[in-house]
Every structure is written in structure tokens, then in C-alpha cells.
Amino acid sequence: EAEQQYKIFVLKYFDERKQETLIAGDMFEMEWKEQIDTSIPTLFIVSGVFQYFYEDKIIEFIKKLKKEFPYGELIFDTARKKSGLRFANWFIKRTGNPEALMHFYIEDSADFSKKTDTTLVEELTFFKDARELLRKKLNFITKLFMKIADYKRQALIIHLKW
């Protein structure tokens, strides 16, 4: 019942495209994999999720993905260094949402890929494209914070494969 309601909610905001599958469920439990052909190459995009869990849980999840999907790639966003996480949590507290604090960050992407037995394909700064696309729509302070975060590499997009 809850799974069906979630799927209806998701489909209200996201269109399911050809060769895309939107699945409701606990990502750590892996029952959702039954809805996907695990024998073909699969790209997982996990956006705005990992930060809310601890590193050991994320590493365990990636290892499960590797076991269930032999030809996989994973793209996700993360804070880099504890300072990036401190900044994000400071900002979250200011918005009045102290229950949504972030825990996961990566000090070194190459080291993290070794911990997960994956290959680091790419590491990108998080806001570069957004700053260019939205430059006329953002206020000065937002642009400044985004630029500082990119300059200090505090927020990243990581691409791993196995």
C-alpha cells in the first residue's frame, strides 16, 4: 500500500522514460532489484540521499549493488571533507530542519573507490553547471556560496563503476 502510494507520488513529478525504471522501496533492503534485469549494464543515480547515512552503510550498499548487478555504474553527490559537511549542516539548521542533518562525506574519492572495490571514473564539482545555467536567476549571496563550495571542492559528484 505505502509502496503504491509512493510510486503514484513519484510518477506525479517524474516521467518514467524508456529504459528508466522508478522503483519505490528501501534501497538498503535490495528487494527492489527483482524489478530490474540484473544481467545488463545498469547506471544508478543516487541524488541527495547518501549524505543522510553513515559511511559504513553506504559502503555496504555499494558492495550489495556490485554483487547483484555485475555490470554497474553509480553516480552520486557528496560533501567532501568534514568542513563541507559542517557547512551543509549549519545551513540545514538555519532552515529549521535539525532532523535532516548529514553524516556521509568523502575525504578522498580515490580512497573511497578502493574501500568499495570500484573504479573512480570521475569527480566533478557540484555547482559548476548550475552556476552557469542559473547565473541571472540567483542572488549574489547564493552565487557566492556556490562558488566557494566549488572552489574548496566541498560538494562533489562522484562517478564509480565496477
Language-model features: where?
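Alpha-helical subdomain
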Residues: E1-W162
